[in-house]
Amino acid sequence: MASTNGETDQVLVEEKSSVRIFKLNRTKQLNAISAAMTSRLLELFLACAEDSSVKLIIVKGKGRAFCAGGDVAAVVRDIKRGSWKSVADFSRKEYTMNYVIATYSKPMVSILNGIVMGAGAGVSIHGRFRIATENSLFAMPETALGLFPDNGASYFLSRLPGFFGEYVGLTGSRLDGAEMLACGLATHFVQSNKLPMLEEALIKANSSDPSVISSIIGEFSQIPNLKKNSAYHRRGRLQRRKTIGSLPQFSH
């Protein structure tokens, strides 16, 4: 797992029995995914996949964000400098990492206790277990930048109920933890004060059996109530508007 100091600092690794915990560590940038972070995460995922002593991966963020997305500022800087190859290399590694996570041979638990947007979704939503909390805030805000939801969003958004995924992708609508659970972006909802106990239980279990892991998470999870003004309550109306074919009506 050789890497530069910069890459190592941006992803902290804890070894707890058969569990490996990857902690995103760019707190000043809300853990935005950088080229160095992408390289390090990809290296770690590939190494752990081949390590028979590793049974479970836990991914979380340090500070108040899980991951606020890709490091757009660095990408813009490279483009202005004419460093298109750097941008292409970053994107290639990032999308490769998304694929590795989506096809990973070992269970992965993403603890989404805070902001999870854009590339942050790519490093978490493709995993088997996604835990939302009362602090979770999800969005795919790329459309506001003149882009489109990437990092595999065309896969996971298209599988949300009705046309809710299209709505989230088109509008960049922000979802809280309860909405993430309701629409399927999260598999579980756990109050943040229970997360340390959950981690300890997962470590103590020493298991790679998805049913065992799901059962453990279930012991700490709950089904929260949606807000009265939640966009998810309007999913039936969104479906009717999409059928009519009016994009402005569908988006508002």
Predicted regions located by residue number:
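Conserved CoA-thioester-binding segment of acyl-CoA-metabolizing enzymes
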Residues: 1-60, 99
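Gly/Pro- and small hydrophobic-enriched strand-loop and loop-to-helix capping segments
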Residues: 127-150, 184-199
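Loop-centered beta-sheet repeat module
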Residues: 160-206
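Hydrophobic/aromatic residues within transmembrane alpha-helices
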Residues: 59, 71, 123-124, 179-180
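Glycine- (often His-adjacent) and acidic-residue-rich active-site loop
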Residues: 61-96, 144-146
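Glycine-rich beta-to-alpha active-site loop
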Residues: 101-145, 167-177
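Hydrophobic, secondary-structure "cap" segments at the distal end of domains
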Residues: 154-163, 245
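Amphipathic alpha-helical blocks and their helix-capping loop/short-beta junctions
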Residues: 191-252
